[in-house]
Amino acid sequence: SRIINAENYDEKRDAISHDWPQLLEKIESNIIFIPNSLTNVEDFLNDIGVNGLILSGGDNVGDDKERDDTEIKILNFAIKNQIPLLGVCRGMQIINKFFSGSIEKNNNSSHVGNSHVVNLINNNIISLLKKNSLEVNSFHNNIITTSNLGKNIESFAITDNDKTIEGFSIRFFQLLV
């Protein structure tokens, strides 16, 4: 979850968009938020028992070391325990960096506060969704392109105009972003 500074207080707080609990409730998932301030993320995840994890969006990789560190620990836990992981926007970016990829500054205003079409380029995803393209919302200031994908990452959704990667999976792992 995103880390914010509470107005009129000298403290950090974890925050998540209300869209997440509403969506997860609709699909009848139990929701447990993982605090960014835990000293042992792996013990916490083992204690609660998880069958899927989400790295949510909001803010940029590198904006808050505490969040970056927590999400790297979550990612390591997911890989070690073969737990499916979904990375959305910032979550996708930190996963790409974890696998030795990079992110770059977005110079295309069509990605910020807009919806746009992405093309699906993986036959398994096309078969699953029964379509060749999707309209997605977009709020990211940083992007992943075909030239800066990490090791073992395979894109499945890409924009027409600037070849921004909007979805990828890890070749050896149940990870979808």
List the model feature ranges, each with a label.
Residues 170-176:
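Beta-strand-turn-beta hairpins that frame and shape the catalytic cleft
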Residues 1-90, 97-104, 109-135, 141-164, ...:
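N-terminal beta1-alpha1 cap of cysteine-dependent amidohydrolase-like domains
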